[in-house]
UniProtKB/Swiss-Prot annotation, chain B:
One of its GO terms (cellular component) is cytoplasm. It is a peripheral membrane protein. Keywords: Acetylation, Cell membrane, Cytoplasm, Membrane, Nucleus, Wnt signaling pathway. Residues 12-87 form the PDZ domain. This is Tax1-binding protein 3. Interacts (via its PDZ domain) with GLS2. Interacts (via its PDZ domain) with RTKN (via the C-terminal region); this interaction facilitates Rho-mediated activation of the FOS serum response element (SRE). Interacts (via PDZ domain) with ARHGEF16. Interacts (via PDZ domain) with KCNJ4 (via C-terminus). Competes with LIN7A for KCNJ4 binding. Interacts (via its PDZ domain) with CTNNB1; this interaction inhibits the transcriptional activity of CTNNB1. Interacts with ADGRB2. Coiled coil: none annotated. One of its GO terms (biological process) is Rho protein signal transduction. One of its GO terms (molecular function) is beta-catenin binding. It is found in: Cytoplasm; Nucleus; Cell membrane. The keyword Transmembrane does not apply. The modification N-acetylserine is found at S2. May regulate a number of protein-protein interactions by competing for PDZ domain binding sites. Binds CTNNB1 and may thereby act as an inhibitor of the Wnt signaling pathway. Competes with LIN7A for KCNJ4 binding, and thereby promotes KCNJ4 internalization. May play a role in the Rho signaling pathway. It comes from Rattus norvegicus (Rat).
Length: 552, 98
C-alpha cells in the first residue's frame, strides 16, 4: 500500500511536469518546479523536526506549497484548454468582431490585517491550568497567486490576531477575487484534546496496516484543509501538527478603500475542532488598489495646443497621458526631469473628449478637444496631433483610459498609496507573543520637562542641599523596622523579563526569581508571604522578609 | 537626615494619569507594583518610582495588599497617581541651574 502511494505520488508529479513542458510555458513551469522542490524540502524538514514550533512552521510551508502547486496546476489546465480550443476553431484574421477592450492591470495590496477574538471566559484572571495556545496564519489567493502571512501564536491574553505583513499582488484585474483563509493549529499536542473524530481514523489505520494506514489517515484528515486532494499530495508526516481552516472570506473591488474597513468572515470550523478559536466574525484590513493607468503613462507624443486667448498661435508641446491628467511639457525631457509642465489638462470621469470636426473652420486637421466642467464654466482645450494615425492612437488611449476608469471605479479617484512589502525575515525562535501591553512603555523623561517647567515658575528657590524626602530612596532605615511606601515597578523594564506562569498580560514584569504558581502575587523570599493587613500601617514586631510584586 | 516612616513628608512629585485598558471583561493597568509598608525594602531590585497617592488615597503607609486593591478597583477607569522618584530631584536642580 505504501509503495502504491509512492508510485501514485510520483506519477502525479510526473504528470504535472509533463503538462508544464508541453505547454512550453516557461514561467509557470519554473514556478511549478520551484514549488515542488520547496515541498520536498518542507517534507524533509518536517520529518526531522523535534520541536513543536519548528514543526508548525514546516507544516505551514507544506500547506502553502501544496496550495500553490494545485493552483498552478489549475492554471496550466486552463491554458492548455484555451490553447487546444484556439487551435481547433480558426478565425479568419480580417473578419470577426474586434477584440474586446480589456481593462488595465493593477496592483492590489492588503495590509494591517486584524482579526478580533471574543473570549467569553469570565474566569480570565484566574487562569486554570496551562495556557492554551494556537498557531495561526492567513493564506491569501488572487488568481493563481498564493501568498501567506507570518505565523502568529495566539493565546487568551490577545484581544486580536494582528498580522504585520503587507501582501501585494501585482497583476490583478478590476474583477479580482481575493480569497482570504485563516488556518489554525494547536501548539500543544492534539492527542490530549481530541476525541471522537479520531476514533474512526484509528480504526481505519489499524485495519490497513499501521504505517500505510497512518499515511492514509493523515492525508484524509488534511483533506479538510486547503482542499488538496488526498491522493495527489499526501501529507508525509505522521503525528505532526495539523492546520484546520478556521474562517474564510472573499474580497473584491467593492471592498477597496484607502483606509480601514471591516469585513465579515465566514466561520468554517466549530467548537469540536481542536483548533477552534473564538473568532468575533470579522476581519479588519486596508485593501488598496493601484491601477496601472494611474501610475504609468499610457500615451505620449507631440501635440500642438491652442494657447489661451490666442487664436492663431499654437504651442508645440510634448504630451504625456498619465493617470487622470494630460501633462503638456515644453520638451520631452521635462517629463523625466520633473520639470513643471506648461499645461495640465484633467482627464477624468466627467471629461468629454471629441475628435475634431470642431476646428475645421480654423483649417487645422487632426484635432481633438477635451472639455471639463468647472462649476458653471466649461473649459475646452483643443489639441492638434501630427497625423491621422497619431489622432487615432491618442483617441484610442483616451477611450482605454475612460474604460479603465469605469472598471476600476473608486480606485481612480486618487492614487492609493501602496508600500512595497519588505522581504519577510525568516521565522526566528518563536518568543511568546504578547499583547498590546508589550508595546506600552511609559516614557517619564518627557514628563520631567513639564514638571521642571512648572517648578521653575512656582518655586524659583535654589535647591542645593538634597531635600529630606530623597532619603526614601537611600534604603537606609531610620527605625529598626524598615518600611517604605509602596513602590511602583516602572513599565520599561531592564533586560531580564520572565514570562508570567499563568498568562496575565505580559508586561515588563520585574521578576527577579523564577516564579511559583501562586495566582496573584509572587514572593521573592523563601518564607511564605505575610499577607495579614496592618491597617495602622505600623510595622509588625518581626522584620518583614518579603518583597511582593503584583500585576495590576 | 533620613526619612522616618509615619511622619509627614514633603516631596517633589509627578502627577501621572493612567486610563485603564480593557482586557476581556476586566480593566487593567498593565504594570506591576512591588513593596508596601509590610514589605522589606532592602529586597527591592529597583529604587525608582514611589507612589504617594492613588486617586486621592494616601499610599505612603499602605501594605502591599492595600496598594494593590486601591489600584485595581473595578469601578474606576482612570487612575491618577502622584509619583516621586530620585531623578526628579536631579531634573529640578538642573532646571534651576540653567
Amino acid at each position: 500500500m505504501q509503495d502504491r502511494l509512492h508510485i501514485l505520488e510520483d506519477l502525479n508529479m510526473l504528470y504535472i511536469r509533463q503538462m508544464a513542458l508541453s505547454l512550453e510555458d516557461t514561467e509557470l513551469q519554473r514556478k511549478l518546479d520551484h514549488e515542488i522542490r520547496m515541498r520536498e524540502g518542507a517534507c524533509k524538514l518536517l520529518a526531522a523536526c523535534s520541536q513543536r514550533e519548528q514543526a508548525l512552521e514546516a507544516t505551514k510551508s507544506l500547506l502553502v506549497c501544496n496550495s500553490r502547486i494545485l493552483s498552478y496546476m489549475g492554471e496550466l489546465q486552463r491554458r492548455k484548454e484555451a490553447q487546444v480550443l484556439g487551435k481547433t476553431s480558426r478565425r479568419p484574421s480580417d473578419s470577426g468582431p474586434p477584440a474586446e477592450r480589456s481593462p488595465c492591470r493593477g496592483r492590489v495590496c492588503i495590509s494591517d490585517l486584524r482579526i478580533p477574538l471574543m473570549w467569553k471566559d469570565t474566569e480570565y484572571f484566574k487562569n486554570k491550568g496551562d495556557l492554551h495556545r494556537w498557531a495561526v496564519f492567513l493564506l491569501l489567493q488572487l488568481g493563481e497567486h498564493i501568498q501567506d502571512t507570518e505565523m502568529i501564536l495566539v493565546d487568551r491574553t490577545l484581544t486580536d490576531i494582528s498580522f504585520q505583513s503587507n501582501v501585494l499582488f501585482a497583476e490583478a484585474g478590476p474583477d479580482f477575487e481575493l480569497r482570504l483563509e485563516l488556518y489554525g493549529a494547536c501548539v500543544e499536542e492534539e492527542g490530549a484534546l481530541t476525541g471522537g473524530p479520531k476514533r474512526l481514523a484509528t480504526k481505519l489505520s489499524s485495519s490497513l496496516g499501521r504505517s500505510s494506514g497512518r499515511r492514509v489517515r493523515a492525508s484524509l484528515d488534511s483533506a479538510g484543509g486547503s482542499g488538496s486532494s488526498p491522493i495527489l499530495l499526501p501529507t508525509p508526516a505522521v503525528g505532526g501538527p495539523r492546520y484546520h481552516l478556521l474562517a474564510h472570506t472573499t474580497l473584491t473591488l467593492a471592498a477597496v478603500q484607502d483606509g480601514f474597513r471591516t469585513h465579515d468572515l465566514t466561520l468554517a470550523s466549530h467548537e469540536e475542532n481542536p483548533a477552534w478559536l473564538p473568532l468575533y466574525g470579522s476581519v479588519c484590513c486596508r485593501l488598496a488598489a493601484q491601477p496601472l493607468c494611474l501610475t504609468q503613462p499610457t500615451a505620449s507624443g507631440t501635440l500642438r495646443v491652442q494657447q489661451a486667448g490666442e487664436m492663431q498661435n499654437w504651442a508645440q508641446v510634448h504630451g504625456v497621458l498619465k493617470g487622470t491628467n494630460l501633462f503638456c511639457y515644453r520638451q520631452p525631457e521635462d517629463a523625466d526631469t520633473g520639470e513643471e509642465p506648461l499645461l495640465t489638462i484633467a482627464v477624468n470621469k466627467e471629461t468629454r473628449v471629441r475628435a475634431g470636426e470642431l476646428d475645421q473652420a480654423l483649417g487645422r486637421p487632426f484635432t481633438l478637444s477635451i472639455s471639463n466642467q468647472y462649476g458653471d464654466d466649461e473649459v475646452t482645450h483643443t489639441l492638434q496631433t501630427e497625423s491621422r494615425e497619431a489622432l487615432q492612437s491618442w483617441m484610442e488611449a483616451l477611450w482605454q483610459l475612460f474604460f479603465d476608469m469605469s472598471q476600476w471605479k473608486q480606485c481612480c479617484d486618487e492614487i492609493m498609496k501602496i508600500e512595497t512589502p519588505a522581504p519577510r525575515k525568516p521565522p526566528q525562535a518563536l518568543a511568546k507573543q504578547g499583547s498590546l501591553y508589550h508595546e506600552m512603555a511609559i516614557e517619564p523623561l518627557d514628563d520631567i520637562a513639564a514638571v521642571t517647567d512648572i517648578l521653575t515658575q512656582r518655586e524659583g528657590a535654589r535647591l542645593e542641599t538634597p531635600p529630606p524626602w530623597l532619603a526614601m530612596f537611600t534604603n537606609q532605615p531610620a527605625l529598626p523596622n524598615p518600611c517604605s511606601p509602596a513602590s511602583v515597578a516602572p513599565a520599561p523594564a531592564p533586560a531580564w523579563t520572565h514570562p508570567l506562569p499563568w498568562g496575565r498580560p505580559r508586561t515588563f514584569s520585574l521578576d527577579a526569581v523564577p516564579p511559583d504558581h501562586s495566582p496573584r502575587a509572587r514572593s521573592v523570599a523563601p518564607l511564605p508571604p505575610q499577607r495579614s493587613p496592618r491597617t495602622r500601617g505600623l510595622c509588625s514586631k518581626g522584620q518583614p522578609r518579603t518583597w511582593l510584586q503584583s500585576p495590576v | 537626615m533620613s526619612y522616618i516612616p509615619g511622619q509627614p513628608v514633603t516631596a517633589v512629585v509627578q502627577r501621572v494619569e493612567i486610563h485603564k485598558l480593557r482586557q476581556g471583561e476586566n480593566l487593567i493597568l498593565g504594570f506591576s507594583i512591588g513593596g508596601g509598608i509590610d514589605q522589606d525594602p532592602s529586597q527591592n531590585p529597583f529604587s525608582e518610582d514611589k507612589t504617594d497617592k492613588v486617586n486621592g488615597w494616601d499610599m505612603t503607609m499602605v501594605t502591599h495588599d492595600q496598594a494593590r486593591k486601591r489600584l485595581t478597583k473595578r469601578s474606576e477607569e482612570v487612575v491618577r497617581l502622584l509619583v516621586t522618584r530620585q531623578s526628579l530631584q536631579k531634573a529640578v536642580q538642573q532646571s534651576m541651574l540653567s
